Amino acid sequence: MGNAIREKTIHGIAASSGIAIAKAYRLETPDLAAEKRAVADVEAEVARFEAAVAKAKEELEAIKQHALEKLGEDKAAIFAAHLLVLDDPELLNPIKEKIQTERVNAEYSLDETASFFISMFEAMDNEYMKERAADIRDVTKRVLAHLLGVTISNPSLISEEVVIIAEDLTPSDTAQLNRQYVKGFATDIGGRTSHSAIMARSLEIPAVVGTKTVTAEVKNGDIVIVDGLDGQVIINPSPELLAQYEQKRARYEAQKAEWAKLVHEATVTADGIHVELAANIGTPDDVKGALANGAEGIGLYRTEFLYMGRSELPTEDEQFVAYKTVLEQMNGKPVVVRTLDIGGDKELPYLQLPKEMNPFLGFRAIRLCLEMQDMFRTQLRALLRASVYGNLKIMFPMIATLDEFRQAKAILLEEKEALLRQGVAVADGIEVGMMVEIPAAAVMADQFAKEVDFFSIGTNDLIQYTMAADRMNERVAYLYQPYNPAILRLISHVIDAAHREGKWVGMCGEMAGDPIAIPILLALGLDEFSMSATSILPARAQLKQLAKEEAARIKETVLSLGTAEEVVSFVKRTFSLA
């Protein structure tokens, strides 16, 4: 190759499917070094700080509005949270006090105070608090830039086709990406559940994150391939490799076009058995994407987004409107609503809950709702009032004991009877089920099945709790094994127990849309697969090629294997999966 630019491949995490090929555009982080200096007029310095905060708020309001229009309500909620940071006296007051008592400049005071909070939150073994650290970092950069008179790069101004290369993309960066020009991105840090990855999937922009070194390897103008299918970034590919990737991209686009033909079809296996494919959603805005991707129902409506990014609890009427909107848009298709699942990795500052040593095993979800019954009853009333507008099913999260389920259902029935006495219409025969995400509930599924109308298996938590491994902790992430036979045996036990009582079983964890899991779950008898909207059509195409009777023959073998690796190898071999 002589002195030609050398091709290089970097590996990362496939965060958003697709293949992007374009020139590199490095999104540089400006120098926001905050040097310490003494100030004579502390009140003027406080005023300068407040002016910078006001300007940052204006920018965030504009970005929030842009996100609302382009990405939907739950993505815009990120910026509502940023605005709350800029109104938080626990952050702002110490900054002002530091300026006044130490007579130092606003930049230094902001940087020191924010760094303290960021370090504190990042040290917590809690993904939600780590995300709050990211929020504070993003907001701090914006205010610092105004104080220093530095311009923060604005991705919305990009006017040619590019692949963005960055250490990380802040939520505000990602919300400003223009799909017309930004064909993909690659970052040094991040994971599949980071803000930037979630937004990339919403925008359907190919992305590879967590490469560690992409910013060190890529220069502006380099030709870059972002392979969001296999988690690779290829820098300055050879003409031969470029041609191969053009073909790979064309095949992927052709495959997507084939999947699109299945939008209005029911999901029927090769031997004529109907399986329901549903979508997981967070807000009413997500219904449009679910229907566009052929969802036969909503298998999980996460209601906590209604409670987040605000300073007080949502009212009964606010919730009623949200639930009614979803039910009406789904036009009679089933909508499974999970009652409030707050705590653990999702906190509400206005509830002022005490900090816990281990929040994932603590006061959260149904445990919190059964104690804070006024809040719980408000949500249940809103759901019951909305029930007449569609096909509502209600499920309770984090159930560990029969007593918890009975207590939650009793409260639901009390609220239903109270509404009926007031002359408020409530639908008949609303199915009431529960999440199976605690091993105790899975083991006792035969007893629960006598009392519930359905189960929804939440594999994300069920795997964590069964394997005693936090999937966000890189050092033990190897133990997060969806295909571990222990997990598969629990799932099989739950499905068999439900079917013996004539009840149906869904799954709403990430596993439900995994191509390797799909034949296993079909073999185990799963009735409903609920997944992110963009996974529905590929799953439908796969299920149409599978015969349930044939898949059922692998059940005994799969459950008899000893390791996750053996399971994956066997399934790939049996069903010719890559």
Swiss-Prot record:
Residues the entry annotates as binding Mg(2+): 437, 461
SUPFAM superfamilies documented for this protein: Enzyme I of the PEP:sugar phosphotransferase system HPr-binding (sub)domain (SSF47831), Phosphoenolpyruvate/pyruvate domain (SSF51621), Phosphohistidine domain (SSF52009)
Protein name in UniProt: Phosphoenolpyruvate-protein phosphotransferase
Function: General (non sugar-specific) component of the phosphoenolpyruvate-dependent sugar phosphotransferase system (sugar PTS). This major carbohydrate active-transport system catalyzes the phosphorylation of incoming sugar substrates concomitantly with their translocation across the cell membrane. Enzyme I transfers the phosphoryl group from phosphoenolpyruvate (PEP) to the phosphoryl carrier protein (HPr).
Cross-referenced InterPro entries: PEP-util_enz_mobile_dom, PEP-utilizing_PTS_enzyme, PEP_util_AS, PEP_util_C, PEP_util_CS, Phosphohistidine_dom_sf, PTS_EI, PTS_EI-like
GO biological process, one term: phosphoenolpyruvate-dependent sugar phosphotransferase system
Assigned keywords, A-Z: Cytoplasm, Kinase, Magnesium, Metal-binding, Phosphotransferase system, Sugar transport, Transferase, Transport
Required cofactor(s): Mg(2+)
Subunit structure, as described in the record: Homodimer.
GO cellular component: cytoplasm
Organism encoding this protein: Bacillus sp. (strain S)
Protein family according to the UniProt entry: Belongs to the PEP-utilizing enzyme family.
Protein's UniProt keywords contain Transport: yes
Known EC number: 2.7.3.9
GO molecular function terms attached to this record: kinase activity; metal ion binding; phosphoenolpyruvate-protein phosphotransferase activity
Binding site for phosphoenolpyruvate: 302, 338, 460-461, 471
Other observations noted: The reaction takes place in three steps, mediated by a phosphocarrier histidine residue located on the surface of the central domain. The two first partial reactions are catalyzed at an active site located on the N-terminal domain, and the third partial reaction is catalyzed at an active site located on the C-terminal domain. For catalytic turnover, the central domain swivels from the concave surface of the N-terminal domain to that of the C-terminal domain.
Top-level taxon of origin: Bacteria
Compartment annotation: Cytoplasm
Active site: 195 (tele-phosphohistidine intermediate), 508 (proton donor)
Domains (record comment): The N-terminal domain contains the HPr binding site, the central domain the pyrophosphate/phosphate carrier histidine, and the C-terminal domain the pyruvate binding site.
Reaction it catalyzes: L-histidyl-[protein] + phosphoenolpyruvate = N(pros)-phospho-L-histidyl-[protein] + pyruvate
